[in-house]
């Protein structure tokens, strides 16, 4: 496994990490098997956006006794209500959810605390100028989070956050098809068929500027949607042909400032396919 430094944070992460989607609805036995297999392979980082109490508890149990060897990127602004995930900007919901996160993970700190799903410049301004940012800074000062980050699908919002100097890490959707698309506050457009009805040949300049700015300012990028939610791996891929996991991983990991791809694997076989990147020949 190759390891990279996450921007100026000094945090070393495996270039292949885990997303949390594959843990949802699978039970504690599967969570333990997946975490054990990942750790054995050298994976040392995980993105946890889900507020699902079972997922949080299962991951906490799986990390018992080895928490300090693992990098947790976990999200503020997500809550569990009525058995459903919800994105929120209400402090009366954010604070209890964060306390629940720490308790279920059996830890007293999160390595990277992420502002969740910030897909418009207005949403970023609301966070940057308000109580949520103050809360994150208080958590950082007390050591309960070590670095501050943000997740986004929109290069405009992400660039505003990066240029503000208020975040250390950006989680962004990176793959060879999304990178052709202009920024939008509606992330659904990234995977809508009509967005690819016309042939697009060049990287969107706003995305290119975002990656270069992250590199220059030392903001590390962790990647989501490297496989486009699986769409890029099928014959109906907007790329015009099915790409392989290795090709998608290689694309993401060769963008400026990218340190790790957080892959939401749903099986041990999918994990194995991703890990094949570490030993793949250049021709693959």
Question: What is the meaning of each model-derived region?
Answer:
Residues 26-38, 89-106, 152-160, 243-251:
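Short, acidic/polar
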Residues 118-284:
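Beta/alpha (TIM)-barrel catalytic core signal, keyed to glycine-rich beta->alpha loops juxtaposed to Asp/Glu
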Residues 1-74, 141:
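N-terminal binding-site loop/beta-alpha segment at the start of enzyme catalytic domains
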Residues 16-29, 79-95, 121-125, 233-242:
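Active-site mouth loops of central-metabolism enzymes
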